[in-house]
Amino acid sequence: MSPNAEPNSPSILKRKASSTVGRGKVANLNTNFNFSAWSDEYVTLNLGDSLQHYDNWEQPTVIISDGAYGILGFEGDTSDHIDLPNWYQPHIEAWSKAAIPSTTLWFWNSEIGWAVVHPLLEKYGWRYVNSNIWNKGKGHIAGNVNTQKIRRFPVVTEVCVQYVREVTVNELTLKAWLLQEWKRSGLPLRRANDACGVVDAATRKYFDQGHLWYFPPTEMFERLVNYANEYGSPQGKPYFSLDGNQSLTGQEWSKMRSKFRCPHGFTNVWARPALRGNERVKTISGKALHLNQKPLDLMKLVVEASTDENDVVWEPFGGLFSAALAARKLKRKAFSCEIDPDYFYYGVQRFNQEVHQDSLL
């Protein structure tokens, strides 16, 4: 405390977060490793701050963020949720610069942690899609809660929130741009129905400017493009072009939104016990190494739902690299960083085991 500080001064009421040494972390190897990176055909893992590595990574189809929660969970985590926007800001800025129109962000956090970061994500062009709840069940808090003294309901959940890019063309949303291009052709709106071979679906769905707007499937988009370029005003050609020289193809159009395939039988509540058993990475003494290690099945769930084989997955805050490992199992490319040397070392061992198992097949 400063000798000149007043009893109610901000320097007393709000101190900078202290080190997390001794809080939650069970392994301190204190070893100078002879490596700081690991890679194979699918995965690139780095020891260090992801802010120093983003520029070397391929553009992401998916970003899986499992960083600061505001609970002093690791060295550098904030002491509460209030400082989380400042902690995430440089990362979100970097993600936004690297993202492509089809990028999906899966943002893991506590409810309040996500809530305070959400406005920042919107500011940088990320559109909220859905909030998914990981329900760990009562077993997660069994024997650890005194219901006679607790002043709230016990917490057994985390959130994994889905965001996509708010794609714009010349500062117009996609639905506004589609309508503008058709009007620019000079053709009446009803002719779009002729182009698509429908009664009224084109004008009713593809050109709607409200909540009923429907992203035109590849085939229908190509029909609109071909019709406008064949029958539209010659002075405005090509229509539906990003560069003014060539119209978008159907394949290019399909990449203007994120990928998602909903697996059968799943909802936005994932009832799955906290991680135990062989998958939980432990020290030689048998203690769980990383308190926030995510289950592989949940990581595989979001990766598989929002990517295809050989797509790129970013895991900026690797921990034990669960997202990268899930991506590798699904034949996706993964780029990940972990700033803590001990977590990095143990995380890499998971991949050494995986490679060894593959060699036995």
Tell where the protein language model's regions lie, with residue ranges.
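Conserved phosphoryl-transfer catalytic core
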Residues: 343, 352-353, 358-360
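Conserved SAM-binding loop
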Residues: 347-348
